[in-house]
Amino acid sequence: MFKVAIIGDSASVSGFASLGLYVFCETEPQKVSKLIKKLAVNNFAVIYITEPVASLVQDTINKYKNSQLPSIVLIPAIRGNTGEGMRAVHEAVEKAVGSDILKN
């Protein structure tokens, strides 16, 4: 059975445990990179990661960009957001349907 994880600072991710996600409160780049690799080989289909933490481990995230699993999805944190998560959603939508239907 596939699992869903979330990685980020405690204030941003701890509430997701009540939704059944595996919560990992981690912000140190080396530990986050190791964690992503570990989750990838342990049946985690989706890994949500806060934008500020994702910016620290972009090389690791890029290794999984063309992989079927896991799907790594950037989400906003309580603070320190870059807008990268939303840009990624816009790019995916544009690639899928041929135009950015989410554009304001």
Residues covered by each model-derived region:
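N-terminal first-folded block
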Residues: 1-33
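N-terminal intrinsically disordered, cationic/polar leader segments
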Residues: 10, 14-15, 41, 49-51
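Short secondary-structure boundary segments
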Residues: 28, 50-52, 76
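Short, charged, surface-exposed secondary-structure boundary motifs
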Residues: 33-38, 82-85
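Extended, charged amphipathic alpha-helical "stalk" segments
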Residues: 37, 62-63
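C-terminal structural segments of small proteins and small subunits
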Residues: 66-104
